[in-house]
């Protein structure tokens, strides 16, 4: 995956106190470039990219890719651009804020964004961790399910294996013969291996003793197993009898339960028929509600037509009332008070209606609210009557004043009478509309209550459907379980027993590890356990039958509970219907009372209108009433429109309810069908269980027969085991005699080996003495080397002194040579001392050839060292090349006699003078061939060294090698002995397993 580009914020560099902030003026459109350059500066020069270490993880997350952090930058950019524009307009940067403050603000905002990022990162990580935990839990659950499936398969495989084990008992006779052959083979192998295992005689004897003890233990164990098998057989007989009696009792109880269930099924069918009748009643009620809805629609249409007519009449009245408005202004003051009172009354009425709508859900509180409303209405009527009385008093005062005006107004009164007729008609129509609206409001309230009840019923129906579905699922699961029990009845008992045995084994592993050593005991115990397992299987099967019966009882109880719930719901529906009827009666009574009150008010209004015909004040009041009525008409138009919308919405809701009712009817039919299927399935299951009980009884009889056969086979096997044990004992005694003979032969061979070892130890002691002598000689030789080195140093000093004296004596030499030739001969002899000394040494060595080798070695070392070694080495073992170079320096060119030469070869890898650094003498011819490439050299060394015997120098190394080989052999014998012990033990276990 390619890494996304990190999100970097514009953060300018931090300016120190010494830095100066200077900004170059820019154009209005150059803000983006400014931010780009600033970003480059911050990232390149100052190295402050405000990106977190975990930023890549945020950028990779798709949730953060959608987040837009740019609005923060846009705000900063806009603020920067505003500052910049102000600066451009003012044309001086001194008055503006310094850039350092702006940078600090941006830096703070960037830090806030960082913190925000960190918090969001932590939240996302927590969510991811939760998701991962949930996934792990799901995977663990899946794995657990798979493991359970595998365990079930393993259990089935184990059952098959046990069946095969029963067949393998017949083949054990051939296996015992094979065991005998294996014993013979092991004896032959042990005879072959005794040649190798010479040092393990005592251990083999112990093994044979252990085998004898094991055989005795086996004999005792077989006798104990016989007794246990007889006891187990008797226990099995008693248990089978008890199980047979229990099965008979269970059959009787099962038949009784079947009869009870059949009676319950018949009762359930009767209850289902009653439920169908109730559903039919509900359908009739729904049809009635539909008819009522249609009637309401027709009423709304009529109201719309009446409103149109009223609007037309209103237009005519407005044109006529414009002339009367001037005369109506005087009575405005009195009318405003009345209007305010009416508005207060309307507000109180609206509040009461809202309270009623809120309290209609609780039917017990509805009566109290109505009583409060009635009292408030009475109070309002009393207030209105008092106001009317005050107005009458005022009118009486104004009558004296208006008598003069009556003459003028008689003409207008005729016109007003006509107007009043129209107004009366309109008022009647308005009152009718008001009544209709009140009825509509009541109907709406009732509809709301009906909707709420319907919603509650829907919720209850959903709960019932959910419960029915759960019950159906449970019933389906039970059916599947019953089918599974039918199919797994044959293997179920064995599975449960095996699971129990496995659990017992796991619990007793820590305490019974010692008991698992003897495999024969476990095999014989299996025969006893099989008989007990059959009894346990029968018990488990009986328990399963009881559990199935309990499950059936639970299902029946659940069905009864569901039926009771349905009855409760039906009772609730009936109570709700009764409540609706009661509420309708109460509403009708209230409407009648309101109509009577309205009629009484109308009578009073008519009386007042007659009085107003005489008085102008009454005319003015009438005009104002007309205006108010016109306003009310407009409000009524709006209310009618809202009512139309509400009625259309209610129609849609009714249609939806009808659809839901149809769905519920279908669901009820489906539930009936399912119930019938359930009853049929239960009947079939009962029949199948009866058949399975018969099969189980047959299987029990078969099991009894198999137990008897197993007892017979066990007796036969016991007899065969006794014969085989006797044969095994005889064979083991024969093998004992053979092994005793082999052990005696091996003892004699071991005695010979011990004698040889004693001889070798004596030779070893002699060789050790020789080594000690050689070491002493080497120490003496080293001391001689040191003495000779000191002599060489003295000779060097003498040579230096002679070289100094040569210069002084050069002039005297010629005279001395002429005078005394004998002196010259002496000098010549003194110059040629090294060669003469060598010749003398060689003659002495030739004369001493008849001596021992040790004396020759000492003489050769003494003769070689003064001639060859001229330098001192601090290293204990010098290299061969240095020795050869020293020898080449002092080799004389003259001479024709070929003689032997000795060279000391030191061990290169050693830095010490221990016994490992032995001197090895090499012949002169070998060294001369190396130095001169097979050319005939002159007689440069006159020392002859005789060839050493291999015993003198090679015996210590051979002795060391012999010791190491002996140790290696002993280690090998011990490892082979251990491996062979393990093999013997394994073979013995196989023989007796």
From Swiss-Prot:
Entry keywords, A to Z: Cell cycle, Cell division, Centromere, Chromosome, Coiled coil, DNA-binding, Meiosis, Nucleus, Phosphoprotein
Residue span of region Interaction with SYCE3: 203-359
Region (DNA-binding): 801-993
Region (Required for pH-induced assembly of C-terminal ends into antiparallel tetramers): 694-788
Modified residues (Phosphoserine): 820
Coiled coil: 117-172, 215-688, 764-808
Signal peptide (from-to): none
Pfam families in UniProt: SCP-1
Residues spanned by motif Nuclear localization signal: 114-117, 697-700, 898-901
Ranges where the record places region Disordered: 824-861
Phenotype caused by lack of the gene: Mice appear generally healthy, but display complete sterility, due to defective meiosis during germ cell development. Ovaries and testes from mutant mice have strongly reduced weight relative to wild-type. Ovaries display an absence of growing follicles and oocytes. Testes show a complete lack of spermatids and spermatozoa. Synaptonemal complexes from mutant spermatocytes form normal axial elements, but lack the central element; chromosomes do not synapse properly, cross-overs are rare, and DNA repair after meiotic double-strand breaks is impaired.
Listed Polar residues bias regions: 831-847
Biased segments, Basic and acidic residues type: 848-857
Subcellular location, record wording: Nucleus; Chromosome; Chromosome, Centromere
GO molecular function list: double-stranded DNA binding
Subunit organization: Structural component of synaptonemal complexes. Homotetramer that consists of an N-terminal four-helical bundle that bifurcates into two elongated C-terminal dimeric coiled coils. This tetrameric building block potentially self-assembles into a supramolecular zipper-like lattice to mediate meiotic chromosome synapsis. Self-assembly is likely initiated by local proton density at chromosome axis, which is predicted to trigger antiparallel back to back assembly of adjacent C-terminal ends into tetrameric structures that anchor to chromosomal DNA.
Free-text comment about domains: The molecule is in a coiled coil structure that is formed by 4 polypeptide chains. The N-terminal region exhibits a prominent seven-residues periodicity.
Described function: Major component of the transverse filaments of synaptonemal complexes, formed between homologous chromosomes during meiotic prophase. Required for normal assembly of the central element of the synaptonemal complexes. Required for normal centromere pairing during meiosis. Required for normal meiotic chromosome synapsis during oocyte and spermatocyte development and for normal male and female fertility.
Protein's UniProt name: Synaptonemal complex protein 1
Source species of the chain: Mus musculus (Mouse)
